[in-house]
């Protein structure tokens, strides 16, 4: 299993495939499958049967995409970047954009800096 450097709410860009160049927010992360769901990317149509709670029909929803096909967006430059981990003076661990050194977010409590 790969250590995921992406969290829910991160801004990412698709780097390969049909949706190459599209930007979006991470809606959901599946660490077991190494996949993420990105808003507006990898849309599929799903046919649903009618039941007591909802009526049937065709709905469009996002499908998971492999993490190797995405890259973080550097908050300073807006370009794709790799992510590194760094410890601050107070001992907290943060995710940092490798290109600019800008802090992307803290590790552990999902709080944006």
Swiss-Prot record:
Cellular component terms (Gene Ontology): ribonucleoprotein complex; ribosome
SUPFAM superfamilies: Translation proteins SH3-like domain
Keyword Ribonucleoprotein: yes
Gene Ontology biological process terms from the UniProt entry: translation
Pfam families named in the record: KOW (PF00467), ribosomal_L24 (PF17136)
Keywords per UniProt: Ribonucleoprotein, Ribosomal protein, RNA-binding, rRNA-binding
Taxonomic superkingdom: Bacteria
InterPro entries with a match to the protein in the record: KOW (IPR005824), Rib_uL2_dom2 (IPR014722), Ribosomal_uL24 (IPR003256), Ribosomal_uL24_CS (IPR005825), Ribosomal_uL24_KOW (IPR041988), Translation_prot_SH3-like_sf (IPR008991)
Subunit structure: Part of the 50S ribosomal subunit.
HAMAP family: Ribosomal_uL24_B
Role of this protein: One of two assembly initiator proteins, it binds directly to the 5'-end of the 23S rRNA, where it nucleates assembly of the 50S subunit. One of the proteins that surrounds the polypeptide exit tunnel on the outside of the subunit.
Family listed: Belongs to the universal ribosomal protein uL24 family.
The protein, known as: Large ribosomal subunit protein uL24
Native species: Rickettsia prowazekii (strain Madrid E)
Protein's gene: rplX
